[in-house]
Amino acid sequence: MKAPVIEVRDLDLNEAVRNVSFTVARGEVYALLGRYGSGKTALLEILAGLRRPTGGAVRIRGVDPYADRNAARAGAVWRDGGLFPGLTVAEVVDTWRRWTLDPLTRDRALRLARLTRLADVPFERLTIGQRRLLDLALALVGRSDVLVLDEPTAGLDTAAAREVWSVLRALAADGVAVVVTTRDPDEACRADRVGVLDEGRLVTGRDAARLRAVRPRAA
């Protein structure tokens, strides 16, 4: 069994997250499934280092994100995404690279997110799905081996959602540890493992294959 890259132990955040524990290995996609208000986004914000837990522990690459934020940094994609008027796709990535001082090249970030052919396209002309892929490219620039994504396919049509998941699976195959949140059981089935959240508690965790067996649409 691979050593975990993400470790969550007995995590609490007031009433939003309650005694949650799970691990994610390198090359694994882990889905947090739950309805609105179940604690998914709050948990992701803790993993991204944006909210300090009131109890328990988090380790990213073995490091406490609140002791060494840079060493434990994770790339993050939030549901609302970013707005970059007046810039092309390549210019957005270049600007982000300079801000984060990350050595990942612009061309590699675009290639990983499958945006190379759109490098010179203005941000305003991108579809919603393409904007989501751009957000993913920026998350890779920030820290490319651990990614957390808040409902990355929300609002996308079927083709765009498939493209996002195709990129995520390719990244996982390259060793990236991925955590996604979703309210859709069929979406969750695309992950390797699923944790079901209810009122801040992780009520079950299982292999996605078991869910796929009873939800054929996600196969």
Which sequence ranges carry the predicted segments?
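The feature captures the beta-strand-to-loop junction immediately N-terminal to the Walker
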Residues: 33-35
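Helix-to-loop junction immediately C-terminal to a conserved catalytic motif
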Residues: 48
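Conserved ABC transporter NBD signature motif
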Residues: 56-72
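Conserved ABC ATPase "signature" region
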Residues: 94, 104-119
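Hydrophobic anchor residue at the start of the ABC signature
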Residues: 136
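Catalytic Walker B motif of ABC-type/P-loop ATPase nucleotide-binding domains
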Residues: 147-151
